[in-house]
């Protein structure tokens, strides 16, 4: 159940740092915030605004609150395969997935160039892209990225096979976001706004800057969604080819870094979910833990106090720097025991060790009034960007 920190800030997090609360309070005090900011169970300090926060604004949007990976999110596909139909070793499958889904910072490919060209021909941002940016859009379409982006093969509580994937709008989403954040900061300084944090600078609805940002943001969200779809298609093709059978049953694709116009209590608002997913009644979502723990397929309960939202994952407990200092490759190998993963690159993945994240089971318990669990997944194969 939620805790009211103050009338402008409500939290579902039982495990939350004081710095996280302080950062969220700055956002909640903004005059453009309508009602209260909602903190999800996975909330932690972020760049621009608190990760795991839902920010309702009236007549304005905060580009840094959406963040630099616009449209980052999850996609999960259930197949008509069971655990006993899988080969004894999935190690060859890991190599096959790696060949068709490039990963890593700045990585691109030409595998799906024609599909990328077709998509871009009918989907253009408001900002006129430079030639090198168009090349980036084309080459990074269908690529994973780095950090906590991943592809996983999972089994649910019935031993049914799922493929789960996490990624966003790649380099072009970052570039567009950074450009608009810089414009918002400049306009705020020129207007001599008294902000506690310049990253909370906003665009006012009806201005040219607002219209351009929203158009670019929606385009980047669509790019992220299409990027995940493209990678999922390729991952499924490799899995089904490897097993020799299999058919897709259903697919769930949801953003967790985005803003959209919604009506709550009869009032039209911009609801920004930074590290949160939409959980209106019946909405299906994917909530991952870490690379060695459980993930969940959920249905939203439509809780208005959370602005019909829920967590986007477990949330980091330790920064990447702290995780690297505290844990070794042996620690990571121990926590990934029994799973197929990029063990030969463990030194590049220590900052993603499960112990660097909050307890996903506690996160799910904290939000029992926000979502209903449909399926619990555990990973048997993990491919993560390095």
Predicted regions and their residues:
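A generic, well-ordered mixed alpha/beta core segment in the N-terminal half of proteins
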Residues: 65-124
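Domain-length cofactor-binding catalytic modules of enzymes
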Residues: 2-23, 32-37, 45-51, 55, ...
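Beta-strand elements of modular eukaryotic interaction domains
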Residues: 28
């Amino acid at each position: 159940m939620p805790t009211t920190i103050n009338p402008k800030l409500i939290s579902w997090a039982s495990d939350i740092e004081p710095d996280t609360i302080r950062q969220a309070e700055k956002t909640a005090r903004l005059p453009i915030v309508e009602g209260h900011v909602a903190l999800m169970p996975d909330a932690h300090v972020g760049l621009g605004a608190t990760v795991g926060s839902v920010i309702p604004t009236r007549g304005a949007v905060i580009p840094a609150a959406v963040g630099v990976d616009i449209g980052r999110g999850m996609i999960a596909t259930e197949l008509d395969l069971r655990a006993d139909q899988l080969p004894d070793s999935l190690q060859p499958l890991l190599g096959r997935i790696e060949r068709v889904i490039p990963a890593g910072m700045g990585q691109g490919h030409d595998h799906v160039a024609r599909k990328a060209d077709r998509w871009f021909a009918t989907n253009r941002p408001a900002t006129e892209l430079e030639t090198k940016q168009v090349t980036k859009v084309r080459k990074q379409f269908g690529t994973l990225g780095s950090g906590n982006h991943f592809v996983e093969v999972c089994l649910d509580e019935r031993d049914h096979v799922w493929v789960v994937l996490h990624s966003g709008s790649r380099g072009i989403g970052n570039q567009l976001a950074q450009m608009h954040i810089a414009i918002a900061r400049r306009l705020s300084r020129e207007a001599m706004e008294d902000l506690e944090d310049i990253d909370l600078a906003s665009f006012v609805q009806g201005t040219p800057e607002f219209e351009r940002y929203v158009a670019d943001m929606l385009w980047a969200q669509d790019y992220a969604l299409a990027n995940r779809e493209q990678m999922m298609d390729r991952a499924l093709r490799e899995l089904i080819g490897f097993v020799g059978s299999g058919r897709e049953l259903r697919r769930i694709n949801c953003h967790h870094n985005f803003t959209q116009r919604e009506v709550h209590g009869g009032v039209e608002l911009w609801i920004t979910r930074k590290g949160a997913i939409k959980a209106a009644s019946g909405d299906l979502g994917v909530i991952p833990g870490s690379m060695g723990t459980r993930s969940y397929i959920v249905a939203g309960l439509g809780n208005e106090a959370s602005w019909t939202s829920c967590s986007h994952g477990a949330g980091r407990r330790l920064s990447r720097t702290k995780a690297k200092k505290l844990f070794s490759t042996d620690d990571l190998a121990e926590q990934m025991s029994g799973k197929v993963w990029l063990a030969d690159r463990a030194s590049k993945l220590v900052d993603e060790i499960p112990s660097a994240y909050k307890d996903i089971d506690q996160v799910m318990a904290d939000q029992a009034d926000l979502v209903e669990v449909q399926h619990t997944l555990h990973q048997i194969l993990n491919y993560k960007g390095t």
